[in-house]
Amino acid sequence: MSSIAPDRPTDAASPHYSRSLLLLLATIAGVSVANIYYNQPLLDSFRAAFPDHASWIGAIPTATQLGYAAGMFLLAPLGDRFDRRLLILLQIAGLSVALVAAAAAPSLTVLAAASLAIGVLATIAQQAVPFAAEIAPPAARGQAVGTVMSGLLIGILLARTAAGFVAEYFGWRAVFGASVAALVALAAVIVLRLPKSSPTSTLPYGKLLGSMWHLAAELRGLREASLTGAAIFAAFSAFWPVLTLLLAGAPFHLGPQAAGLFGIVGAAGALAAPYAGRVADKRGPRAIISLAIALVALSFVIFALSGASIAGLVIGVIVLDVGVQAAQISNQSRIYALKPDARSRVNTVYMVCYFIGGALGSSAGVAAWRAFGWTGMCAAGLAFAALAGASHLRGGKRGG
């Protein structure tokens, strides 16, 4: 579409492309995205700290994920227009301020507002992933994206582990303070090691945002991948907040540390990321996405049949996270090939939908848990997996 111009196409490998740079981008993605998941194993701690608003604790992860979706829409497209290195450093500064506000929050309302700001500013990862796609040669793009996404998934999952341990011994407020220290250290490395990126668009900010609607209308494959990804992440997000509540009650009576330990189990899914990327590079992503959706559905069957046993939870978490990660890598490999000169904006459309799905999944999971218990949460997860499957099959019939 002419309304998306003026952009300059770019699909060549950068001279900066290296394994060490990919690992730095993976670290940036993991450390930044972890901030939107630190609160999930802390829900029982929030309930104890703010007993007058215990029924509203589900608003904290929901606010964070909605903030992330808003940040992706408002901030992530700037990567096509400005140097991503500068954008990353500016967002780290703002994120640190929001984390300090969360650590000092005197009420659940203030914590929710700080969580919203954390979500908006933690979109640093959405500069790192397109950066990897930009610097990689086309034949290695899936593997490069997979490497950075490994860091992102490890950040998501180990965030729960780290938050659980810190909260167990130092209290939940210390979790946010520790994150500030990690971000400051990361910023120092970025200043020394991360190269500048090359902007691919000269559109002013308003038109840059508006062009995303044109991209979504133009690219059928982007619409399909966005709905499929949103439904898969909704299933993923329905599970994790409820896990904390499940483990805190009978028969487990376990604290946030135990909930966090499941992050280590789930990190096994990150091992599938580079492999999924390589397979997507060689065989195409559609078959990988089909398998991934089946794994996500299977995980909730395992959760339902296990009767909420520890063994069933461990097996289900591994299956769930492998499925989610494989689907994410394959979807992103697809969308980055659709419009090389607009990768940040294409990624924004996809990831805004993705995290709106996550916010809906968090709310639906907690609501289903309160209304119908563990079985209700499992049913919600299966429903989201079914939606992902329907979207993917429909796209396949249309040749998307």
PLM regions and their residue ranges:
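Structural signature of the two symmetry-related core transmembrane helices
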Residues: 86-100, 287-302, 382
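Conserved MFS/SLC helix-loop-helix module at the cytosolic interface between two early adjacent transmembrane helices
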Residues: 70-108
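Juxtamembrane intracellular "pre-TM" segments in multi-pass secondary transporters
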Residues: 7-16, 194-226
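Intracellular juxtamembrane helix-capping segments at the cytosolic ends
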Residues: 124-136, 326-339
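Cytoplasmic helix-loop-helix junction between adjacent transmembrane helices
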Residues: 114-152
